[in-house]
């Protein structure tokens, strides 16, 4: 039995399998076949075995995207929650946080190879794990100085976040803006909201 997954459905897996084993289904090298499946860029882990009645079982764990890089040297790639970078697919697209990155990370396809990459990943996971922020934040813009600007989903202002640190404090200020200031002043009164400085929230109309 072959389990469906987002990037690799039954049809794709069966076609890939038939191309690998051809007509000799009785003499399958499972390690070799697992390695061939593992070489597919969207596969995180794979286990292949035969059950007691001879059925071939394939279990595939795919990478689950949590953000998509849409600019910079790594554009057209997804990121998973552990920082693995893998390509988008024509077979499947998931709506996730968009990243405009002006920072070149490592060549080993791992976001966590640098301190900034680890801190950025922590911020992305923080957003995705929060019910409120995951709904209102659609894009992150990362400049060459490693400062981040948040682009909300439903309003026009930019939120200047700065370096992805002090997450609890900065997101609490963003929460304060949307729950206290916006109801009093309106959604699009301010063009920028700056939360990068400690103990300050600066709202600018210009």
Model-predicted segments: where are they?
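Short secondary-structure junctions
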Residues: 38-44, 127-136, 184-188
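Terminal hydrophobic membrane-targeting helix
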Residues: 1-92
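Soluble extracytoplasmic domains of inner/organellar membrane proteins
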Residues: 105-109, 113-175, 179
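Extracytoplasmic/luminal low-complexity segments enriched in Pro/Gly and acidic/polar residues
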Residues: 161-206
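Extracytoplasmic
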Residues: 8, 28, 51-55, 72-74, ...
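Hydrophobic residues embedded in beta-strands of well-ordered beta-sheets
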Residues: 54-56, 85, 147-148, 200-202
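Extracytoplasmic segments of membrane-associated envelope/inner-membrane machinery
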Residues: 58-139
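Flexible glycine-/small-residue-rich
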Residues: 2-3, 60-64, 100-103, 152-154, ...
């Amino acid at each position: 039995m072959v389990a469906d997954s987002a990037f690799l459905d039954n049809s794709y897996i069966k076609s890939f399998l038939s191309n690998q084993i051809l007509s000799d289904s009785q003499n399958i090298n499972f390690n070799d076949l697992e390695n061939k499946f593992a070489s597919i860029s969207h596969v995180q882990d794979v286990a292949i075995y035969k059950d007691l009645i001879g059925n071939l079982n394939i279990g595939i764990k795919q990478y689950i995207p949590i953000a998509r890089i849409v600019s910079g040297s790594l554009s057209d790639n997804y990121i998973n929650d552990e920082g693995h970078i893998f390509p988008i697919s024509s077979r499947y697209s998931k709506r996730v946080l968009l990243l405009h990155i002006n920072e070149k990370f490592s060549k080993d396809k791992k976001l966590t190879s640098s301190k900034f990459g680890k801190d950025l990943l922590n911020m992305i996971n923080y957003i995705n794990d929060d019910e409120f922020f995951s709904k209102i934040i659609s894009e992150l813009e990362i400049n060459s100085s490693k400062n981040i600007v948040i682009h909300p989903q439903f309003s026009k202002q930019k939120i200047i976040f700065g370096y992805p640190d002090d997450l609890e404090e900065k997101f609490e200020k963003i929460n304060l803006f949307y729950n206290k200031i916006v109801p009093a002043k309106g959604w699009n009164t301010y063009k920028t909201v700056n939360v990068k400085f400690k103990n300050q929230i600066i709202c600018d109309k210009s």
